[in-house]
Amino acid sequence: MATPVIDRAALAAIVVAAALGCRGGPPPAPHLHTVAIRAMAFEPARLEVRVGDEIEWVNDDLVPHTATAPGAFDSAIIAPAARWRTRVTRPGDVAYACTLHPMMTGTVQIR
């Protein structure tokens, strides 16, 4: 009885095709999330994002604010009608606040 023989090129093609099929596709594209600052509050106050996503704070209030999370991000002053953006790079739950108005708080859950 004859045994089938596969040449090396065909075997290599099968291995490469199998490896590519197991990748699961490219990672999802980053998303831009917007947090509005209005009436002395962050909206939404709780945001869930993925590593690599961007968050933009838009100051729709009449006074300046910040979005500050020590060790994670710091917008400095965001003037009225201005915006500030950052990309998140590490997973975790990040609490942030406005340094000018400490009662203004928010949380970013980074997955």
Predicted segments, located by residue:
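Bacterial N-terminal signal peptides that target proteins for export
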Residues: 2-11
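Extracytoplasmic copper-binding redox domains, predominantly the cupredoxin/blue-copper superfamily
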Residues: 2-3, 17-111
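Sec-dependent N-terminal signal peptides
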Residues: 12-16
